[in-house]
């Protein structure tokens, strides 16, 4: 999570299942390629949801911007912490933007790292305003 200003949030999940070869090659090696202050132990999905809820609690009107619909779906799936149970988050707005000619990965300092990709997306969107 990268706000316009303020503290960033970077979470990595504990995963013991099989990984697609592309993820193994292009994502996993770079999971901890973030500022040292943001490197943390892998979290369970439930702990990650609670950390995300705590982070969002500090925002009166959170707006999540994505350039791919699946990003919104995965974000929302993370909030589900059990059957019929979701993390306690404030009301959240989502905006999916189409950015012809812009590639998050191509503009990211560390392609396919969620933090760096989010920074690239944020910086590009702010440059359009």
Each predicted region: which residue ranges?
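Acidic, Mg2+-coordinating catalytic module of metal-dependent nucleases/exonucleases
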Residues: 68, 104-129
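Substrate-recognition/cap helix-loop segment adjacent to the acidic, metal-dependent catalytic center
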Residues: 71-90
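Residue-level marker of positions within ordered structural domains that often coincide
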Residues: 6, 80, 126
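Gly/Thr-rich phosphate-binding beta-strand-loop-beta motif of the actin/hexokinase/Hsp70
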Residues: 1-2, 117
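Short, flexible loop segments at boundaries between secondary-structure elements
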Residues: 86-109
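Residue-level signal for well-ordered alpha-helical scaffold segments within enzymatic catalytic domains
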Residues: 54, 77, 123-127
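Conserved non-catalytic scaffold segment of RNase H-like nuclease domains
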Residues: 2-66, 70
């Amino acid at each position: 999570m990268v706000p316009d200003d303020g503290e960033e949030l970077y979470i990595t999940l504990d995963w013991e299942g099989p990984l697609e070869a592309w993820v193994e090659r292009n994502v996993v090696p770079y999971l901890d390629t973030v500022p040292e202050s943001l490197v943390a132990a892998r979290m369970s999905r439930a702990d990650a949801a609670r950390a995300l809820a705590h982070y969002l609690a500090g925002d009166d009107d959170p707006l999540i911007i994505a350039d791919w619909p699946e990003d919104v779906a995965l974000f929302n799936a993370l909030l589900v912490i059990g059957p019929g149970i979701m993390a306690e988050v404030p009301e959240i707005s989502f905006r999916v933007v189409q950015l012809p000619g812009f590639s998050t990965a191509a503009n990211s300092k560390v392609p396919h790292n969620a933090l760096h990709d989010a920074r690239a997306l944020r910086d590009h969107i702010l440059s359009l305003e």
